């Protein structure tokens, strides 16, 4: 669920609040072309959720743990495990692309996100 995703982001050394309104894809919804590597993390995360179809990606909880600096998804339910993996990959992506974070994309207007990008 979104709370667990936020905890993953925080545990990887980032603040979840940095990603709520960032670029064209971080936060609710998304459109256009990702603006940088950080925004691309959100784009890939949205695509990952999109592959899950109508599954409730925002509010379904799953089992995971932090182990030796990594996130381990341990749910036996395949959909919950897939959901966890979507969140895990994004949290790691944020940590790995932190040096691309650009404050000019925080609070970025969706009206500037006009190009198209396919998953």
Curated annotation (Swiss-Prot):
UniProt GO BP: arachidonate secretion; lipid catabolic process; negative regulation of T cell proliferation; phospholipid metabolic process
Major subcellular location class: secreted
Cofactor remark from the record: Binds 1 Ca(2+) ion.
Pfam families in UniProt: Phospholip_A2_1
Active-site residue list: 45, 87
Binding residue positions for Ca(2+): 25, 27, 29, 46
Necessary cofactors: Ca(2+)
CDD domains listed in its UniProt record: PLA2c (cd00125)
Tissue: Expressed by the venom gland.
Subcellular location, record wording: Secreted
InterPro entries for this protein: PLipase_A2 (IPR001211), PLipase_A2_Asp_AS (IPR033112), PLipase_A2_dom (IPR016090), PLipase_A2_dom_sf (IPR036444), PLipase_A2_His_AS (IPR033113)
Signal peptide (UniProt feature, chain positions): none
UniProt-listed Enzyme Commission number(s): 3.1.1.4
Enzymatic class: hydrolase
Keywords carried by this UniProt record: Calcium, Disulfide bond, Hydrolase, Lipid degradation, Lipid metabolism, Metal-binding, Secreted
Catalyzed reaction equations: a 1,2-diacyl-sn-glycero-3-phosphocholine + H2O = a 1-acyl-sn-glycero-3-phosphocholine + a fatty acid + H(+)
GO molecular function: calcium ion binding; calcium-dependent phospholipase A2 activity; phospholipid binding
Post-translational modifications reported in the UniProt record: Contains 6 disulfide bonds.
UniProt GO cellular component terms: extracellular region
Tree of life domain: Eukaryota
Misc. remarks from the entry: Two very similar relatively non-toxic phospholipases were isolated from the venom, CM-II (shown here) and CM-I. The amino acid composition of CM-I differed from that of CM-II in having 1 more Thr and Ala and one fewer Ser and Lys.
Function of the molecule: PLA2 catalyzes the calcium-dependent hydrolysis of the 2-acyl groups in 3-sn-phosphoglycerides.
Family recorded in the similarity comment: Belongs to the phospholipase A2 family. Group II subfamily. D49 sub-subfamily.
Name recorded for this polypeptide: Acidic phospholipase A2 CM-II
